[in-house]
């Protein structure tokens, strides 16, 4: 991997010393939601090192929640640019507020459904199975939306189609994925965290 690592110390980087410290950025958030739905810092670091192995790449987090992956990745691997897309407006607001607190410039957050995003605008992708709440209703984060297995199938098919349109060499990091959304021409090139974190490259 290249040397796309911190060349200077971010004065607010103490937030990334532990998951507990980071979660204090969101004092009103439910701690159980943090543990179940947000990317652990150690996972974010490993995924960022894989996705941002080259400088100036654009990385999209699909279903970014409060922005934990994007913020952590932007801190650990600052020579890439990170975008999070999230359909819950309240979480996007929290992500933007957290970004301001930690003082990172190489990250932004969008409010919307990933279906509206042009994957051509991004080089590599991170996915912590944000569709699964449509597959297992016990995993619902809240009652803001309707959930169904039909939506799960629709989203996984759409993501597979979008990923399939990307060129050879495209990288994807998945965490706790069912792999239904992975095109056949993406191959696993590495795993971490007892195989829950997988690294893929399109051949």
Predicted regions and their residues:
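Conserved SAM-binding strand-loop segment of SAM-dependent methyltransferases
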Residues: 103-112
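Short conserved loop adjoining the S-adenosyl-L-methionine
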Residues: 116-120
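Conserved SAM-binding motif I beta-strand of class I
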Residues: 81-86
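C-terminal substrate-binding/active-site "lid" region of AdoMet-derived donor-dependent transferases
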Residues: 134-203
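Conserved SAM-binding loop of SAM-dependent methyltransferases across substrates and taxa
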Residues: 68-79
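Conserved class I S-adenosyl-L-methionine
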Residues: 56-65
